[in-house]
Amino acid sequence: MMVACVDAQRDTYGVESICAHLPIAPSTYWRHKAQEADPTRRAARVQRDAVLRPTIARVWHEQEQVYGAEKVWRQLKRDGVVVARCTVERLMKDLGLRGVVRGGPAVVTTSPDATAAVPDLVDRQFSATRPNQLWVSDFTYVATAEGFVYTAFVIDVFARRIVGWKVAATMHTDFVLDALEQALLRRGTDDLPDLVHHSDRGVQYVSMRYSTRLAAAGIAPSVGRRGDSYDNALAESVIGLYKTEVIGRRDRWQGLEDVEFATLRWVDWFNHRRLFGPIGYVPPAEYEARYYQQATAA
């Protein structure tokens, strides 16, 4: 800022005269100008920062502009860039880059008391030792110019991978059933031994049609307690990421097709490029691939 001010006035008043009225010494000004003319004369940190800034900005933009300093740093490490986390945080602040902040209410559609007979087989233990051991499901709403639309997800707990999803104009049973069918198609019903499907007690998930489809695929149903979001915490966590990283970043959504396209793009990024701390800061697809490679080698 000071250097730019001197630059603007020095032909008229001279450097020494201007610096006499500003908190900058003439020697400091001339040193800065020499470094501008010859970048090799800059301090090592300044030179390093100049190289890192575009790299950090590239990673942030490639990762859907949602990563904070921690995830940007982790991605840089995966890319072979050696840099301290505090440096990434400092340069992101200089560049005006920041991660998105989660927040927002959830949709709740509780079912009649008759569904209390369906057990909670998970008991808040959202962990799995292999793919297709535990799936969790949930859905949320999105306000658009054409009215509310709804997005449902089926997530494989092992790698946090989204294996099924659906965007619809209504939240009837068909809507969540379509997400389940997509998951079954992708995973294949022949490779689902002892699979548990967990959800909240929403009317869609405990309906006769949904329960029948689970039974036909040999999947054991599990539901959390009424009104307790912690009983489906992992699914709600993914919903929270979706609302933060996709929906909340736009002021206005036009309609179903608009949301559907954005969701398609996000799910692909989520599964194949987004880093997850609980699985070692790798994408879900990579984590699953490692499992199958190790299983084959054994």
Whereabouts are the PLM-identified features?
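Charged DNA-binding/catalytic regions of mobile-element recombinases
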Residues: 1-298
